[in-house]
Structure formats: structure tokens, C-alpha cells
Amino acid sequence: MKPQLSFFAAILLTLFSCQQYRQKEVDRLDITFLTTTYIKTTPVKDQGEWPVGSLYAYLSWIESCRIHKGDSLELSPIYLMRFLCQEEITMRKHPDFQLTPNDAAILMRKYGITLYDYYRKHLNIRPEWFIQNQQFFASHPEQLDIVLDTAFGYTPSHIMLYGATYTPQDLMQSVWTDLSETSFIHPKQIAQDDNRILIDTMKNLLYQGESIIWYGDTLQEGYSFPQGIAIITDKDSPTLISTASRHLHAMHIIGIAHPSPRSSLPTYDSSTTYFMAKDSHGTNNRREGMVFLSEQYVRLHTMAIFHPSLGSVENQWGLS
């Protein structure tokens, strides 16, 4: 038994060392970026422990659209999280609070939106608590409303903006009238050489002053929120895309950047173009809440990108 134990211990040590090497490579990189394209946006917010990056990214995208049109406003993700929580607990057999940007659009069409200053609160409750108490709320639905009002706050029936009064649904129609035209482009099973279609689409939109919602895998060794970068760290990383261990997350792409000449570049990632993403985990990282995604990382780990101009392309591509 001892030789077998030693053998397995050696394997575990080797795997641990490889993991440490890959993570250390990300952590020891000293990359500064020169931003060549930047789209104005609102301050970075923090989704906390709730898996609702799609809500934050979508609202941030709408906010940038409004800035582009000449006005500035901030929208409340907490307002939509309240209704998401209500639907997850009352309508789903196995709630997990996971949602895509398309799910976020459906919530907005259904419940409208409100302003950040009208509905903002630091949440002291976790989604797991609601899941653990789902059966209780099924038999006591009135208690769920009480808990939601206490945890999230009472929902406003009317909002004042620019001297006019809106309901949340009216505000949604006033702020963004093209929700029915939204669509996603899914990069499905394209040969790696043809992934330039995805990259070129993103670049062209950004060069035109249009930001993008990115939806992809952030559970890779080369993804580091503390460092604010996402790179390829392993020659075999393309095989990771088909694993079941993905962690899908949405971010708002607001710019294009390039490493400065004095930057220490990653070993396996030769990207000279990085996409500047506004994340929703606060500003406590090296890039004040931003994450720079390398072109190669985007090629390999994108599930979908969003912009209305992409037409009605959906599920034409996609990751197996």
C-alpha cells in the first residue's frame, strides 16, 4: 500500500504544482495597458455573492447607450434582483439564481426598471438562504413578500425623471425602446482560425462607439480578477472549453487596449489586443474594477456576445 500511496501523492503534488505554476504566471505579470478605444460608462458596482452578472452588465450597457444619446442615469440592479428572487423561489423546482443576459432582458420587459437612487441597498442576505427555505415559502407565500420587502426594500410604484413621472414599465420603454430587437451571436464550433469573425465583430462595434455585453467562462487559471486580466496560460487550454466546469459570467465590454512596450507578457498568450471589460465585483482590484480580456481568451472562452445590430442570429454558433 505504501508504494501506491507514494505514487498517488506524487501525482497530486505534480497536479498541484502545475496549478500553482499557471496561477503564479498570472499573478506575477506586470502588464500596463494603453487604451485606444473607450466608451463612457457609469461607476462600477458590486453584485456581491449573487450570480447576477448578467443583470449588472445589461444595465451598464443601457447606461452607456444613454450617455451616448446625451443623458446620464444609473439603473438599479437590486430592483430586478428582487423579482428574480421571487420568481426563482415560487416558479422553479430547483432555483439557482443563474441567468443569462437574455433572461435579464425578459425580467426588464416584465417588471420594468427603476433608478439606482430610488432602489439601492446593501444586501445582507445570500441566495442560498432563500433556496434552503423554499419549501417554507411555498406553504407561506405571504412571508416571502415580507422577507423580500425587508431584504431588498419596497418597490417604487412611480419614478420622477427630468420632471416627468414614470412607472417602472414606462421608464423601461422610455429609456430603451429596442429591447424587442435584442439578439445574441453564439460562436459555435467555429474552427479556431475562423474565430476572427467574433473578434472582428467586437472590434468593429467598439470602433463605432458601441459597447457590447460579453458572456463567457471565467473559471480558467488565466482569469484573475485581482490582477484585472484574463489570458491563456496553457497550450492545451482549448480542450478546457468542453468541460462541465465552466463558470459563466457577463461583463460589459467598453474598450480596446494594448499592452505597453515595457509590460511583461504571458508565456502562452501572444495577444496584442485586449478587450476592456467593466466587471461587477466592486473596484477592489488592480484595474479599479475592470478586467482586460486577451483576444485569445475571448476566442476560446466566449459563450455569447450581445448587441442589437447583430440581427436575429441566435444559436447559429455555440459551444458544445
Regions picked out by a protein language model, each given a short descriptive name:
Residues 22-30:
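Short, low-complexity, disordered segments immediately C-terminal to signal peptides
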